[in-house]
């Protein structure tokens, strides 16, 4: 019976790509692709191999060797990858040390990735909103895509770390003259939060996209 590593090598060879290119096209980190193709990781997470199977248009059982690879047709790949990027889903705490925390996410098999068609850099990441401060526009559980390379402008939604706080938060930035303020959105809060931006506060990125899943 074929193994995951041998099947992966066969599939990459059939479409003339290497591990680096497969990583670029699927969003799976190159070191992880390397460990899979060399047999160093024989028990990967489903979230790791699912994008690979989708890219090569095979099912999971075929990819890992439980079923034979299709032999009655030419090798196929999905053509949908070109318009999409995949970014790591990180914690609000890790957002405060991004991109220094990036190497951990690039080498971990536990990382979840989310797809986006937003025009973002390789340093972009995803966060899941917690709490009701930004409702009704961004309800609890909304996934946001954050671009750390973009400078914020008036009315942008930004991820920011306030002085002395261990985690980041999402707020809207309001500019009035030379002053800038951070605003929550929920009108049902006892006190709508509008805080003047202090010099010690740290911008961590601008929200590029928000995604809400209604079926969980």
Swiss-Prot record:
Residues 8-63 form the HTH cro/C1-type domain. One of its GO terms (cellular component) is protein-DNA complex. Keywords: DNA-binding, Transcription, Transcription regulation. One of its GO terms (molecular function) is sequence-specific DNA binding. The keyword Metal-binding does not apply. CDD domains: HTH_XRE, S24_LexA-like. It comes from the Bacteria. GO terms for biological process: negative regulation of DNA-templated transcription; SOS response. Residues 19-38 bind DNA. PANTHER family: LEXA REPRESSOR (PTHR33516), LEXA REPRESSOR-RELATED (PTHR33516:SF2). This is Uncharacterized HTH-type transcriptional regulator CBU_1416. It comes from Coxiella burnetii (strain RSA 493 / Nine Mile phase I).
